[in-house]
């Protein structure tokens, strides 16, 4: 009996209302947690994983690399790229897989569907040393040309930012590698709708029934995108038409170039000894004169016609077209000087 009464009292206790007395605090619950404490934290502006003991840094780098490529989570891909950028920005640079493997795996992110992933990938590219990027310009341009003709306006715009970076760090390699000159010009033609065949028809007959095909739609946002395309084209042409600065004679460098082992990969790429046969678009144009000759023959009429139309639109597009027009006029004047100098040299050689 005693035990049963005790159980009844315990059950009844759960339903009894507690009587509050003046001056006494309310009783604390059985599951009460004290949250009145204050936490202390240490903020570190910069830190590196190299300071951690017992951590497989190489394995961690490869894990971040795999996450950046294969993760289905957009946020995880962004965080992995941020961590890789930190490793590449550290001093000394921490890159256990090498730049060739890094680029091979990450270059498809140029056309990633998430804007933040593309932005963080561009930050990673900017952390790479230019000397390590130069041997891989041809491969990078292949992905850039794919992004330039993408259906998404945002992806095309971000791809142009990658091309701007490549021109900044490796201007000569960008315009002189196989396919770097004409194939990239073809991509600009697809973006802007400046077709060489249409331009030649306009110049001969004065009119044509051909329609202008462009990846840009008429809107304020796409107007800004087209202005960026024209600006990047001007930058690309400026790099291609830049006067070549002759190196002063150095006897040691002269003999080294003949007898020593080359220090750059594939130094005889211009001969194309073992590669597939190249067409005109895939050919190398290693000097300013060859680039200018093929541009005059194939692209000047189309670019001039496009610039005239862009100037008439005014606004940001018109301003960008004015910059491009200035580059074309400067290149034309420089080309005339080069031709005159060549004629003088030929005359002097003939007289000698």
UniProtKB/Swiss-Prot annotation:
Superkingdom per UniProt: Eukaryota
Main location: nucleus
Coiled-coil boundaries: none
Location(s) in or outside the cell: Nucleus
GO cellular component terms attached to this protein's record: nucleus; rixosome complex
Entry keyword set: Nucleus, Ribosome biogenesis, rRNA processing
SUPFAM superfamilies per UniProt: ARM repeat
Family named by the database record: Belongs to the IPI1/TEX10 family.
Protein function: Component of the RIX1 complex required for processing of ITS2 sequences from 35S pre-rRNA.
Quaternary structure (record): Component of the RIX1 complex, composed of rrm-9/ipi1, rix1/ipi2 and ipi3 in a 1:2:2 stoichiometry. The complex interacts (via rix1) with mdn1 (via its hexameric AAA ATPase ring) and the pre-60S ribosome particles.
Protein name (Swiss-Prot/TrEMBL): Pre-rRNA-processing protein ipi1
Organism per entry: Neurospora crassa (strain ATCC 24698 / 74-OR23-1A / CBS 708.71 / DSM 1257 / FGSC 987)
Chain's gene name: rrm-9
